[in-house]
Amino acid sequence: MFDFDATLPLMALQFVLLAIILNAIFYKPLNKALDERADYIRQNETGGQQQLAEAKELAAKYEQQLAQARKESQDIVAQAQAEAKQLATEAVAEAQKEAIAKKEAAAQEIEQQRQEALKTLEQQVDTLSRQILEKLLGPELVK
């Protein structure tokens, strides 16, 4: 099957030479390209992780600012509602004061007119009483 003659060392030498040439021409550049690709992937992964961390940090800041803005807007709305309620209360109180003042003024005017009407009625009663007495008794007796 195998002949152990001078061709065997020559074949072994060719195999070693082929391995050295392939190593220099093919395997070293291939390993170098694979290593560079692995470094590139590692760098991109590290950069991606950093960008993801920055994005998460920015998202957290945004959420915090959004929460603060919501709280401030709720405070402003609550303050505006309180001011509106106070203004409404003051307006109602002022309207009640005006209504009471008008009611009192109307009551005083009614009382004044009542007093005037009573005076007028008293005068008319006196006049009518005198006229009746004059008719009954005569004008000479009534004074």
From Swiss-Prot:
TM region positions: 6-26
Source organism, top-level taxon: Bacteria
Gene Ontology annotations for the cellular component aspect, listed alphabetically: plasma membrane-derived thylakoid membrane; proton-transporting ATP synthase complex
Cystines in this chain: none
Record bears the keyword Oxidoreductase: no
Main location (coarse class): membrane
Keywords (A to Z) from UniProt: ATP synthesis, CF(0), Hydrogen ion transport, Ion transport, Membrane, Thylakoid, Transmembrane, Transmembrane helix, Transport
Family named by the database record: Belongs to the ATPase B chain family.
Protein task: F(1)F(0) ATP synthase produces ATP from ADP in the presence of a proton or sodium gradient. F-type ATPases consist of two structural domains, F(1) containing the extramembraneous catalytic core and F(0) containing the membrane proton channel, linked together by a central stalk and a peripheral stalk. During catalysis, ATP synthesis in the catalytic domain of F(1) is coupled via a rotary mechanism of the central stalk subunits to proton translocation.
Annotated Pfam families: ATP-synt_B
GO MF term (any one): proton-transporting ATP synthase activity, rotational mechanism
CDD domains per record: ATP-synt_Fo_b
Keyword Ubl conjugation: no
Membrane topology summary: Single-pass membrane protein
This protein's encoding gene: atpF2
Complexes and interactors: F-type ATPases have 2 components, F(1) - the catalytic core - and F(0) - the membrane proton channel. F(1) has five subunits: alpha(3), beta(3), gamma(1), delta(1), epsilon(1). F(0) has four main subunits: a(1), b(1), b'(1) and c(10-14). The alpha and beta chains form an alternating ring which encloses part of the gamma chain. F(1) is attached to F(0) by a central stalk formed by the gamma and epsilon chains, while a peripheral stalk is formed by the delta, b and b' chains.
Localization: Cellular thylakoid membrane
Official protein name in the record: ATP synthase subunit b'
